[in-house]
UniProtKB/Swiss-Prot annotation:
Catalyzed reaction equations: 7-aminomethyl-7-carbaguanosine(34) in tRNA + S-adenosyl-L-methionine = epoxyqueuosine(34) in tRNA + adenine + L-methionine + 2 H(+)
HAMAP family: QueA
Keyword Zinc: no
Similarity comment: family membership: Belongs to the QueA family.
Keywords: Cytoplasm, Queuosine biosynthesis, S-adenosyl-L-methionine, Transferase
GO cellular component: cytoplasm
Task performed by this protein: Transfers and isomerizes the ribose moiety from AdoMet to the 7-aminomethyl group of 7-deazaguanine (preQ1-tRNA) to give epoxyqueuosine (oQ-tRNA).
Organism: Helicobacter pylori (strain G27)
Record-given protein name: S-adenosylmethionine:tRNA ribosyltransferase-isomerase
Catalytic EC class: transferase
Encoding gene, per UniProt annotation: queA
Assembly behavior: Monomer.
Biological process terms in GO annotation: queuosine biosynthetic process; tRNA wobble guanine modification
Length: 345
């Protein structure tokens, strides 16, 4: 069936529609509103996004905070040039970390970030990840100090389709105004559309709940299996506070700010009697595993053959998704992380 064929999720996007910078002020970004019941499309801007939110809906937001996850170092302490890139993914046990390292690397290699700080490669994993430990003058760093190291020496992990180095503006623009808990290596991009003023109005006028899904590097990986149902999605760290769990259990109408919030809600609502706050979320939503508990979604425009495009198709159907994306391209909407948005009602 074509809805499970990977090629059905391909489309052509002109390069000039890939957003390399955000629209400022945020409210000026374009917004496509699709109302499923009436099959109508409205073209507007984020100045008016809250006008379209259903008044009784619970608004769910992901408050993860993006780490400065890209580090550049040298394999020799005395070399001034830093050409080896370490992409921090997540903490592992005993203050070690899972990373990607560009170039040839072997167990025991060290990567120096300055005269004191360095990382040592502990293990080469089968999936291309490298297990490393961080040190300050041979003293192992704990997680708190590793985060300080990333903040001091790291760069914002802009997506690979943004063909430029990170700049000072990315430190705050590639971060939602309600980001709170550090741990993501990619921003939950629908959240980027809210200014402080917009957030305050949302929190004042609507029921809301926060959760934390630390977006992982796997979010940039495309689906590669010919039958999308065979795809194994990446696992991400999820935390839902008890207060938010109680609100979610009681709510009948839910609007998620972004696909990460939606995946989190769908994962949680399918659990039987959850009795903890921390989870490992690995839910892959598509037409054979449809959305059951979320009614509305605010999202950006996603990459061809991506799991996120399949999620949108699970909500409105493959043909309607293709139709809307065709219209968005014709109307010169800006795509991907720094791009414009789409509200599905």
């Amino acid at each position: 069936m074509k809805e499970f064929d990977l090629e059905s999720y391909d489309y052509y996007l002109p390069k000039e529609l890939i957003a390399n910078y955000p629209v400022l002020p945020k409210e000026k970004a374009k917004l496509l509103v699709y109302e499923r019941r009436s099959q109508t499309i409205t073209h507007t801007t984020f100045e008016h996004v809250l006008d379209f939110f259903p008044k009784n809906a619970l608004i769910v937001l992901n408050d993860t905070k993006v780490m400065k996850a890209r580090l550049f170092g040298s394999k020799h302490a005395f070399l001034p040039s830093k050409t080896t890139e370490v992409f921090f993914h997540r903490f592992f046990k005993d203050n070690t970390a899972l990373t990607q390292i560009k170039g040839k690397i072997k167990v025991g290699d060290k990567i120096f970030f300055d005269e004191n700080y360095y990382a040592e490669v502990l293990e080469l994993l089968h999936n291309g990840q490298r297990l490393i430990a961080f040190y300050d003058n041979q003293t192992p760093l704990n997680q708190e100090n590793i985060l300080k190291l990333l903040e001091q020496y790291g760069h914002m992990p802009l997506p690979p389709y943004i063909k430029r180095a990170d700049e000072s503006l990315d430190a705050h623009e590639y971060q939602s105004v309600f980001a709170k808990h550090t741990g993501a290596v990619a921003a939950p991009t629908a959240s980027l559309h809210f200014s402080q003023h917009g957030l305050e109005k949302l929190l004042k006028d609507f029921k809301h709940a926060f959760l934390t899904l630390h977006v992982g590097a796997g979010t940039f990986l495309g689906v590669e299996t010919k039958d999308i149902r065979e795809h194994q999605i990446h696992t991400e760290v999820l935390r839902i506070p008890k207060k938010s769990q109680e609100i979610l259990q009681k709510s009948q109408e839910i609007l998620c700010i972004g696909t990460t919030a939606l995946r989190s809600v769908e994962y949680f609502k399918r659990l039987e009697n959850p009795n903890q706050e921390a989870f490992e979320c690995d839910i892959f939503l598509h037409l054979a595993n449809p959305i059951l508990h979320v009614n509305y979604l605010l999202t950006n425009f996603h990459l061809p053959k991506s799991s996120l495009l399949m999620l949108v198709s699970a909500m409105i159907g493959l043909e309607k998704t293709k139709e809307i994306y065709k219209i968005a391209i014709e109307k010169k909407y800006r795509f991907y992380s720094y791009g414009d948005g789409m509200l599905i009602l």
